[in-house]
Each structure stands twice: as C-alpha cells, then as structure tokens.
C-alpha cells in the first residue's frame, strides 16, 4: 500500500476539494493516460487495484506510471463508540483528486490494448474519468 514514510503531523483536517487541477494535468511520461473529469478521493487500495488490473491485462509489456500519491490521512473512530474522547486513529491514506488530474499513464503499448487496460482501471476508480492521448489532451474535460 502507498503511504508516506513519515509526516510532520499524524492527523489532518478534512479540508475542501474545490477547483480544477493546475498541476499534474498534462501527460508527462507516456502517450495515453487516464484523466479525472470530476472531484473525488482515491485511497491507496484503489490505486493499487487499478494498477494490478492494468498490468495484468497488458501482461507486463510497456511501462505504467502512477501519477498520484495518497498523502492525506483519513481517520475513523471504532464502531459503536460514543462521541468525544478525541479524533479517531488513522484508518487509510487518500488523495483529493480535482478535475483535469492525470491519474495513470502508459507508454510502449498498442493503442487498442492500452485502451482496454485503462478501461479496466477506470472501473476501479471512485470518480468519473476519461482516456486521453497526447493528441487529444488539449480538451480539458
């Protein structure tokens, strides 16, 4: 599972996920990618399950880049616990995703096969996405 090695503070405030992505919104390494088209939150398990689905479909050919990293701790209190007595313990690590963010990239795979693999990964993600190529990337949403 992806998570930071160490953080300055153990717990964070929830915050708000507004606006569109100004960083990580263009293809940098590959030639075909998955781009988010709505707000969402992705955790380390979802990142890993989508990566496994893609790499199994392409049979380890080519190269896959994960362009997101879960660096925000999500806390939860145990079930059937009364309110109060402090904030819950860290349950999982997440990343807030804004529209326009590139989530995965691929290189060195035939486009038809790459689209099938990315479609498998799309079904594992909790927000709407679209497949973009270097040529079609200028269309933001």
Swiss-Prot record:
The keyword Ribosomal protein applies. CDD domains: Ribosomal_L16_L10e (cd01433). Residues 1-23 are annotated as: Disordered. InterPro entries: Ribosomal_uL16, Ribosomal_uL16_bact-type, Ribosomal_uL16_CS, Ribosomal_uL16_dom, Ribosomal_uL16_sf. One of its GO terms (biological process) is translation. Pfam families: Ribosomal_L16 (PF00252). PROSITE patterns: RIBOSOMAL_L16_1 (PS00586), RIBOSOMAL_L16_2 (PS00701). Keywords: Ribonucleoprotein, Ribosomal protein, RNA-binding, rRNA-binding, tRNA-binding. It comes from the Bacteria. GO terms for molecular function: rRNA binding; structural constituent of ribosome; tRNA binding. GO terms for cellular component: cytosolic large ribosomal subunit. Part of the 50S ribosomal subunit. Binds 23S rRNA and is also seen to make contacts with the A and possibly P site tRNAs. Belongs to the universal ribosomal protein uL16 family. This is Large ribosomal subunit protein uL16. It comes from Helicobacter pylori (strain G27).
């Amino acid at each position: 599972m992806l998570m930071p090695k160490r953080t300055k503070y153990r717990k964070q405030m929830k915050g708000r996920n507004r606006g569109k992505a100004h960083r990580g919104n263009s293809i940098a390494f590959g030639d075909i990618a998955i781009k988010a088209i709505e707000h969402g939150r992705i955790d380390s398990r979802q990142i890993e399950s989508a990566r496994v689905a893609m790499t199994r479909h392409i049979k380890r050919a080519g190269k896959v880049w994960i362009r997101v990293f879960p660096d925000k701790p999500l806390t939860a209190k145990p079930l059937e616990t009364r309110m109060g007595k402090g904030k819950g313990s860290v349950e999982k690590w997440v990343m807030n995703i804004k529209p326009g963010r590139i989530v995965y990239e691929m290189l060195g795979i035939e486009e038809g096969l790459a689209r099938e693999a990315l479609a498998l990964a799309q079904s594992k993600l909790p927000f709407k996405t679209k497949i973009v190529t270097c040529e079609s990337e200028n269309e933001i949403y």
